[in-house]
Amino acid sequence: MAKAPVRARKRVRKQVSDGVAHIHASFNNTIVTITDRQGNALGWATAGGSGFRGSRKSTPFAAQVAAERCAEAVKEYGIKNLEVMVKGPGPGRESTVRALNAAGFRITNITDVTPIPHNGCRPPKKRRV
C-alpha cells in the first residue's frame, strides 16, 4: 500500500502591529532583538553576525547594520510601531535607534533599561596598557 505524499505545510506568520526592540549595546558587540508585546522573539541580529569582527564589531556603524538586518527579518510580521528598550553603555545605542526609525518603524517609546547595581559586585580592575 503506497503512502500518500507528504505535503509541506506553509508556515503562517502571525501579524503583529506593535513590537518591542531590545537593544543590548555592550562595549564589544550590539545585539538587536525584536519581540512582540508578550516577549516572544520575532527576529534578531548582531553586529558580529553581520560580518564585523574584532574592533570593527564595536562601532556604531556595525550596530546600524545589525539593526537594518533585524528590521528586514521582521518585515513579514507587519510591525508598524516599535517600543525601544536600550540596555548597556556601548557605542551602538543611538545609531541602532536611528536605523530602526529609518527602516520604516514608528518609534513610540525609548526606555533605558541598563541595570544599575546598588553597590553589588566589585567592578573589574582598571586596564594598564
UniProtKB/Swiss-Prot annotation:
Gene3D superfamilies (UniProt xref): Ribosomal protein S11
Domain of life of the organism encoding this protein: Bacteria
One GO molecular-function entry: rRNA binding
Pfam families found in the cross-reference section: Ribosomal_S11
GO biological process: translation
Keywords associated with the record: Ribonucleoprotein, Ribosomal protein, RNA-binding, rRNA-binding
Annotated GO CC locations: ribonucleoprotein complex; ribosome
Assembly and interaction partners: Part of the 30S ribosomal subunit. Interacts with proteins S7 and S18. Binds to IF-3.
Family per record: Belongs to the universal ribosomal protein uS11 family.
HAMAP family: Ribosomal_uS11 (MF_01310)
Protein purpose: Located on the platform of the 30S subunit, it bridges several disparate RNA helices of the 16S rRNA. Forms part of the Shine-Dalgarno cleft in the 70S ribosome.
Family matches, as NCBIfam families: PRK05309.1 (NF003698), uS11_bact (TIGR03632)
Name of protein: Small ribosomal subunit protein uS11
Organism the protein comes from: Enterobacter sp. (strain 638)
